[in-house]
Swiss-Prot record:
The lineage of its organism: Bacteria, Bacillati, Bacillota, Bacilli, Lactobacillales. This is SsrA-binding protein. Required for rescue of stalled ribosomes mediated by trans-translation. Binds to transfer-messenger RNA (tmRNA), required for stable association of tmRNA with ribosomes. tmRNA and SmpB together mimic tRNA shape, replacing the anticodon stem-loop with SmpB. tmRNA is encoded by the ssrA gene; the 2 termini fold to resemble tRNA(Ala) and it encodes a 'tag peptide', a short internal open reading frame. During trans-translation Ala-aminoacylated tmRNA acts like a tRNA, entering the A-site of stalled ribosomes, displacing the stalled mRNA. Gene3D superfamilies: 2.40.280.10. It is found in: Cytoplasm. The gene is smpB.
Length: 155
């Protein structure tokens, strides 16, 4: 958990499995009133989400925020594009790093910080299948080593 991070509402575990995360940054989200109520109720899905830089703005797509139950006519479309709030220099840096390099922007986590919904955005490079298998193999080896060390220390 990063310093000053609030209540975690949603995580994208699939992103850490499918991508190698190179860099992360925090972004604000532009939401309507009923959307923020749904986010606070943890009714958000980041699984297929991604972000794009267009015309000097960063847009979040394919993130599902369920309609708020008491929202009736004020509810928005669940998978609409949402603007992310970043500094101009951050946007320019992201645009340079994602243009033509095989890098993409994936949402990693949504949390509430000081009453505002924040998104942890990751600059990521896609993993190949053999990279995923290698990661799983390394993780299992570390677990086996930890298990053996625990057994030795208990004697």
């Amino acid at each position: 958990m990063a310093k000053g991070e609030g209540k975690v509402v949603a995580q994208n575990k699939k992103a850490r499995h499918d991508y190698t995360i190179v860099d992360t940054l925090e972004a604000g989200m532009v939401l309507t009133g009923t959307e923020i109520k749904s986010v606070r109720a943890a009714r958000i899905n980041l699984k297929d989400g991604f972000a794009q830089v267009k015309n000097g703005e960063v847009w979040l797509s394919n993130v599902h925020i369920a309609p708020y139950e008491e929202g009736n006519i004020w509810n928005q479309e669940p998978e609409r594009r949402r603007k992310l709030l970043l500094h101009k220099r951050q946007i320019q840096k992201l645009e340079q790093e994602t243009k033509g390099t095989g890098m993409t922007l994936v949402p990693l986590k949504v949390y509430i910080k000081d009453g505002y919904a924040k998104l942890l955005l990751g600059l990521a490079k896609g993993k190949h299948d053999y990279d995923k298998r290698e990661s799983i193999k390394r993780r299992e080896q570390n677990r086996d080593i930890a298990r053996v060390m625990k057994a030795v220390n208990q004697r």
